[in-house]
C-alpha cells in the first residue's frame, strides 16, 4: 500500500505531521505539501512560472517534499513526474477549520485530494471543524480509524473522493460517523475596506457567512450534533435536472 499525503496549510502545519504520524504502519508514505499556507486556493495550478521542490529537514517534517505552489500543484507534480510510482490512496489534511457545504469549492484541502481523484486515485480530505488545533491527536486517531475502515476490504479501487469533517473534541475517535451530503452557506460577509500607508484602498475578503442549509443529513448538521461527517464527492457539475428545461427554452435538442 502506497499512500500520498498532502495539505493546504503548508508543510510546517501541525495537521499534516499529525496525519502522517497517525498513518504510520499502513503502508509506504510519501508526503508533499505547499511551502506556504495556501488555504482557499481551490484547484488552482501554477502556470505562469516553474515550480521548485525541496526536501524538508528536521523533525517532524524530515523527508517531506515541499513545493512552492498550491495544494493542487503539489499532488499534480507528485503524480505526474516526481514519484516513481502511483499511490494507492491520496490523503489531504488535517486542515485547520471546517470544509463543509460550498466551502469545498474554495478548499485547498479538498482540492489536493480531488487532484488525486482526477488522476484515478481514491482520495480522502480531512478537516477539523474549528480552528486552533485543539484535540489534534483525537482528530488524527479518527482519520486513522477511517482509513483503516476503508482499507479493511483490501486496497482501494476507484476513483472515489471523501470529504471528512471532525469535531474538535477529545473524544472525536469515539463519536458516531455519518455519511452526509453537502449543506450550503449564505454568501460571505462584505469585504473589509482599509487604507494602506499610501492612502490607497485595500480590501480583505470577508469571513464566511452562516449556514443556510444545515438540516438533518447535511455535513453542518452532523458536526453540530457531535458526529463525524463523511461526504462522498464528485466533480460533475452538470445540472442534470435542468438539461431538458434549458433545451426547451433555447429551442435546441439535448445532446
Curated annotation (Swiss-Prot):
Cofactor stoichiometry and binding remark: Binds 1 divalent metal cation per subunit.
Positions of a divalent metal cation binding: 8-9, 39, 95
SUPFAM superfamilies referenced in this protein's UniProt entry, alphabetically: SurE-like
Keywords, ordered alphabetically: Cytoplasm, Hydrolase, Metal-binding, Nucleotide-binding
Subcellular location: Cytoplasm
CC per GO annotation: cytoplasm
Broadest EC class assigned to this enzyme: hydrolase
One Pfam family it belongs to: SurE
Requisite cofactors: a divalent metal cation
Catalytic reactions of this protein: a ribonucleoside 5'-phosphate + H2O = a ribonucleoside + phosphate
Molecular function via GO: 3'-nucleotidase activity; 5'-nucleotidase activity; exopolyphosphatase activity; metal ion binding; nucleotide binding
Enzyme Commission number, as recorded: 3.1.3.5
Transmembrane stretches, start-end: none
Top-level taxon of origin: Bacteria
InterPro entries: SurE, SurE-like_Pase/nucleotidase, SurE-like_sf
Similarity comment text for this entry: Belongs to the SurE nucleotidase family.
Chain's role: Nucleotidase that shows phosphatase activity on nucleoside 5'-monophosphates.
HAMAP family assigned to the protein according to its UniProt record, in alphabetical order: SurE
PANTHER family: 5'-NUCLEOTIDASE SURE, 5'_3'-NUCLEOTIDASE SURE
NCBIfam families from the UniProt entry: PRK00346.1-3, PRK00346.1-4, surE
Stated name of the protein: 5'-nucleotidase SurE
Lineage of the organism: Bacteria, Pseudomonadati, Pseudomonadota, Betaproteobacteria, Burkholderiales
Amino acid at each position: 500500500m502506497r499512500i500520498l499525503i498532502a495539505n493546504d496549510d503548508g508543510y510546517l502545519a501541525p495537521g499534516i505531521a499529525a496525519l502522517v504520524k497517525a498513518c504510520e504502519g499502513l503502508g509506504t508514505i510519501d508526503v508533499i505539501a505547499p511551502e506556504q499556507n495556501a488555504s482557499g486556493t481551490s484547484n488552482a495550478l501554477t502556470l505562469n512560472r516553474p515550480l521548485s521542490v525541496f526536501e524538508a529537514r528536521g523533525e517532524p517534517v524530515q523527508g517531506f517534499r515541499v513545493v512552492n505552489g498550491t495544494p493542487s500543484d503539489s499532488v499534480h507534480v507528485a503524480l505526474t513526474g516526481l514519484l516513481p510510482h502511483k499511490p494507492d490512496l491520496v490523503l489531504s489534511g488535517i486542515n485547520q477549520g471546517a470544509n463543509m457545504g460550498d466551502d469545498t469549492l474554495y478548499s485547498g484541502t479538498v482540492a489536493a485530494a480531488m487532484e488525486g481523484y482526477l488522476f484515478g486515485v481514491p482520495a480522502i480530505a480531512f478537516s477539523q471543524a474549528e480552528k486552533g488545533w485543539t484535540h489534534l491527536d483525537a482528530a488524527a486517531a479518527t482519520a486513522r480509524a477511517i482509513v483503516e475502515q476503508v482499507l479493511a476490504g483490501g486496497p482501494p479501487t476507484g476513483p472515489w473522493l471523501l470529504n471528512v469533517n471532525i469535531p474538535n473534541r477529545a473524544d472525536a475517535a469515539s463519536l458516531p460517523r455519518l455519511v452526509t451530503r453537502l449543506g450550503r452557506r449564505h454568501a460571505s460577509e462584505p469585504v473589509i475596506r482599509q487604507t494602506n500607508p499610501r492612502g490607497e484602498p485595500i480590501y480583505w475578503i470577508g469571513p464566511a457567512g452562516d449556514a443556510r442549509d444545515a438540516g438533518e443529513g447535511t455535513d453542518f448538521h452532523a458536526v453540530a450534533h457531535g458526529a463525524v461527517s463523511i461526504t462522498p464527492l464528485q466533480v460533475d457539475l452538470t445540472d442534470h435536472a435542468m438539461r431538458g428545461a434549458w433545451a426547451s427554452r433555447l429551442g435546441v435538442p439535448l445532446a
